[in-house]
Design a protein with these regions (language model features):
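Structural recognition of the conserved hydrophobic beta-strand(s) that form the central parallel beta-sheet
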Residues: 155-161, 182, 191
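Short glycine-rich substrate-engagement loop in P-loop NTPases that contacts/grips substrate
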Residues: 93-126
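Conserved lysine of the Walker
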Residues: 71
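Hydrophobic anchor at the beta1->P-loop junction of P-loop NTPases
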Residues: 63
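Short regulatory helix/loop adjacent to the ATP-binding pocket of P-loop NTPases
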Residues: 147, 164-180, 192-197
Length: 305
């Protein structure tokens, strides 16, 4: 795969990606295609596919969830696999030229013409999707969904972080033409897929269905894998760090960075509520500390006896 990045009109970056001799484009500040990041198998893919087959003519898809659970990644992965072409507009990084297009969406013919020209991507009626990534950062784009869906030429996927997407609706008319689905961190089975374990989940299902005991050796092995999942967690970035580095300390640092982002989001919403929002995290840390302290005391007492 060949990759090349070019500047067009000053601040607009177009990443040119050559795959098997074919030219692919993306832009708006998203550079994931130039990073060779892994894309994990997610169960929500089937929900998105159901929307495409049965609802996309009348509704845009809104994928909502906490930050860093993989919303943007799964949206783009789905667009690559299920559509002839796609445009991804990342409102966290996109250019002013793209933002200005939403000042006038009454003439949609001209709107789409300009969008294709600026992005360097051709759209095909009924076969292309436009992704509004981090749509909570630009509510005007979300409001435009009503008219874009009614136009019927293309499909639309929006992604938004839970906290901000609920807050940033004060000055807009929330479109009813949205089919909402929630995305969460990776569950145990998705974690197994990510680490290349295609056996354990089926084994557990078989044991439960047939009400059979696992046996000591199998039980120990399954519990070892489950404890690993509990240590790494379900955030894709943390799992990626574990797979690449095999270092739990680095995994913890990655998770700490994610929690820091959450804290920053809480402050943006309402600084005085930060303590309330963070209380569950603090309680977890207190309970974990007490549990570890009690275990150490009990073991010390047993040794003295």
């Amino acid at each position: 795969m060949g990759k090349k990045c070019e500047k067009i009109n000053g601040d607009l970056t177009v990443i040119l990606v050559y795959m098997n001799g074919d030219l692919r484009y993306t832009c708006g500040g998203k550079v994931d295609l130039c990073m060779d990041k892994p894309v994990f198998k997610r169960k929500i893919y089937d929900e998105i596919y159901e929307w495409k087959e049965n609802r996309s003519d009348k509704y845009a898809l809104l994928i909502k969830g906490a930050r860093r659970v993989g919303k943007s990644t799964i949206a783009e992965e789905f667009a690559k696999k299920e559509f002839k072409s796609y445009i991804l507009i990342d409102f966290a990084h996109t250019s002013k030229a793209i933002i200005d297009l939403f000042d006038d969406t009454y003439d949609l013919d001209f709107f789409f013409l300009q969008l294709q020209q600026l992005m360097g991507i051709r759209l095909y009626e009924k076969e292309s999707v436009i992704i509004f990534d981090e749509v909570q950062l630009f509510p005007k784009a979300r409001q435009a969904i009503k008219y874009l869906v009614a136009d019927g030429r293309y499909k639309y996927i929006e992604t938004g972080s839970l906290l901000s997407i609920k807050k940033n609706t004060k000055d807009i008319l929330i479109p009813s033409e949205e089919h909402k689905i929630s995305m969460f961190p990776m569950d145990f089975e998705e974690f197994l897929w990510a680490i290349g374990d295609e056996v354990s989940a089926e084994t557990i299902r078989h044991l439960i269905k047939n009400k059979k005991p696992a046996g000591n050796a199998m039980h120990r092995n399954l519990m070892r894998i489950f404890r690993l999942y509990m240590l790494v967690g379900g955030m894709p970035q943390a799992i990626e760090t574990y797979i690449e580095k095999n270092n739990l300390q680095l995994v913890d640092e990655t998770k700490r960075e994610i929690v820091d982002l959450y804290e920053e989001d809480f402050v943006k919403i309402e600084p005085v509520l930060l303590e309330i929002f963070m209380m569950p995290y603090l309680l977890i840390l207190v309970v974990m500390h007490q549990d570890i302290f009690c275990q150490v005391q009990e073991r010390g007492f047993a040794l003295r006896r």
